[in-house]
Amino acid sequence: MGACGKSVEKTYIQSINQARKSDVRITIEHQGDKLISTDSVSTVYYKEAGVSKDEIKNIIANYDAEFKDVKGYSHSAEYKDEYFVEKTTIDYTKAELKVLQEKKLITAQKSSKIDYISYESILKSFKSIGFKEVKNGKFEELK
């Protein structure tokens, strides 16, 4: 596998939009190219996102119902007056990758049997949708 003997490292990435008042922070743990876990914290303001508090509660309740039995996956949301904070963790050492694939929590070619998730490919994927790497976990704050 090549990951043996290597220490677990953390990479921090962020997608922040001051105008839309949304902030997504992801901490990626990996050992070599093998992904260990992803931990994301999203802060989104209702008004700027164009949704009400009740609408987002319904969306997240449906999401939670669909994914509640997925091993290695945890999710929570905290609702404030003007915004909500959503936390999602996927522990790839506990999860069944086939189930994550079926639930579209990870992407891989349908026919491919996967043994692990590549850190390099997931980082490239996040960067392709606008995430930027953050040094030492020093995230930009919403203003």
Language model features with spans:
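C-terminal motif of bacterial Sec signal peptides marking the signal peptidase cleavage site
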Residues: 2-3
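Subset-of-secretome marker
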Residues: 7-143
